[in-house]
Each structure stands twice: as structure tokens, then as C-alpha cells.
Amino acid sequence: MNSQLVGILLSALLGVALGHRTRCYDCGGGPSNSCKQTVITCGEGERCGFLDRKPQPSSEQAKQPSATLSHHYPACVATHHCNQVAIESVGDVTFTTQKNCCFGDLCNSAVASSVTPLCILAAAVTTLAWLLPGL
């Protein structure tokens, strides 16, 4: 069997065997101030994202507008909930939660990640070896 083909197959198997779950910043449901040091590994079927949660004004609050407290925090989001709005009631307060997703490790922060997943690195090395047979 061709050594290049063996390399490609090994890289593919390595990527599948290791798997890759996304690592994300998480605040445990709290506001995003100083939570960027908390890194969690999302479960299967989850991606990094942000939750924007704000209470809906009651009829009394609508008559007297005031500042509305809105929470924006990073979290793992189920893929099927990405870019959706959910309405939930807690006691007599109704909240609207917007769930937005992003792609890649630690993408739900302003700080870019410098960590390259092993399977991408292996694929890049294999591709270079395949394109440059003299290596």
C-alpha cells in the first residue's frame, strides 16, 4: 500500500479515535464579568455560544420605563438550540433568552484561542507530505 495513503488513513483514524469535543468559556449561568478563566468541555451535540437573557417588562413596568437588566454570558449551547429565542417564566417574571453559537474551541470570548486541535495538525502534516513527496 502506498505510504501516502497509509498516512492519510492513520490521520483519519487518529482524528476519529481521539474525537474532539469543543472547549468553551462558561459562567455557570451568571453574568460574564471575570468568568473567562472558566473553561469547560462541551458535551456531544453542543457548541460554544452566548446566552443573552433579559426580563420582559410587565404591564406596570411598561407604564414606567426604566433600565432593564440584561445578562450576556458564554456557555455551551445544544446545537439544535443555536440562534433560537426561548421564553421562560420564573415566578411572575418572564425572560427572553437568545442562544447564539460560534465555531471552534474557545470561540465565545474576545480572546482568540491559540490551541490547534491535534486532528487538524495531523491532517495538515499529512496533506503537506502528500503534496510534497520529497519529504
UniProtKB/Swiss-Prot annotation:
Transmembrane segments: none annotated. Pfam families: UPAR_LY6 (PF00021). Glycans are attached at residue 68. GO terms for molecular function: acetylcholine receptor inhibitor activity; identical protein binding. It comes from Mus musculus (Mouse). Expressed in embryonic tissue and adult lung, kidney, brain, liver and spleen. Its main location: membrane. Disulfide bonds join 24-48, 27-35, 42-76, 82-101, 102-107. This is Lymphocyte antigen 6 complex locus protein G6d. Homodimer. GO terms for biological process: acetylcholine receptor signaling pathway. One of its GO terms (cellular component) is synapse. Gene3D superfamilies: CD59 (2.10.60.10). Residues 22-121 form the UPAR/Ly6 domain.
